[in-house]
Amino acid sequence: MPKHSKRYNEVRKLVDRNKDYDLNEAIDLAKKVATAKFDETVELHIKTNIDYRKSDQQIRSTIALPHGTGKEVKVLVFATGEKAEEAKAAGADYVGAEDLAEKIQKENFLDFDVAIATPDMMRVIGKLGKILGPRGLMPNPKAGTVTNDVASAVKEFKKGRMEVRTDKTGNLHIPVGKASFDNEKLKENIKSAYEQILNLKPAGVKGNFIKKVVLSTTMGPGIKVDPATLTQ
């Protein structure tokens, strides 16, 4: 069992682990237990009923939050010529082709949060799969990160659009803001994220799609949320 800090053990006492909190209560409580010396990220964890062993039940898509996540997103773009210029104009942090691929390979350069590529660049970045894949950074059409419209993609991801994908136990982990956000912004982000996930339900899922919803902060305990209050 992991050993928790004294601070964590103190704030954990504030949370009733057997209760499903109303969303408003959960947000209040999440902010109350966010006592670290930095602005903690508020995270929405959704346990789904998907069968991860079936490829048609895996979720991989993107969602956008009305108020963003509060994090500055670094975007890298693999493109050349006119598309490279469009990416730079849109605010991409790094733009290149073979040179960037080589930097990632040889220097383990990973100082970015999102990688976007034009379709013709897949031949260049194919060899980066072992490096970028496990970190969730490999460009993918399903995630909207393989596209010819690089300018729009850069702007969207800069504004807070993010990739969401189920892990190996069928769970989703979604940053929905910072503890410093006011309650209404957090509420709108959480409800928006949840509704977008509901719309991504794979056709093959049997029974209830959502099994459990938990809200937490970076250093705080999990707070169970009544799913019904997320769609009211």
Curated annotation (Swiss-Prot):
InterPro entries per record: Ribosom_uL1_bac-type (IPR005878), Ribosomal_uL1 (IPR002143), Ribosomal_uL1-like (IPR023674), Ribosomal_uL1/biogenesis (IPR028364), Ribosomal_uL1_3-a/b-sand (IPR016095), Ribosomal_uL1_CS (IPR023673)
Pfam families linked to this entry: Ribosomal_L1
CDD domains: Ribosomal_L1
Keywords, comma-separated and alphabetical: Repressor, Ribonucleoprotein, Ribosomal protein, RNA-binding, rRNA-binding, Translation regulation, tRNA-binding
GO MF annotation terms: rRNA binding; structural constituent of ribosome; tRNA binding
Coiled coil (residue ranges): none
Protein origin, superkingdom: Bacteria
Any single biological process term in GO: regulation of translation
Any one Gene Ontology cellular component term annotated for this protein: large ribosomal subunit
Quaternary structure and partners: Part of the 50S ribosomal subunit.
HAMAP family given in the database record: Ribosomal_uL1_B
Family: Belongs to the universal ribosomal protein uL1 family.
Function: Binds directly to 23S rRNA. The L1 stalk is quite mobile in the ribosome, and is involved in E site tRNA release.
Protein name per its UniProtKB record: Large ribosomal subunit protein uL1
Higher taxonomy: Bacteria, Thermotogati, Thermotogota, Thermotogae, Thermotogales
Designated gene of the protein: rplA
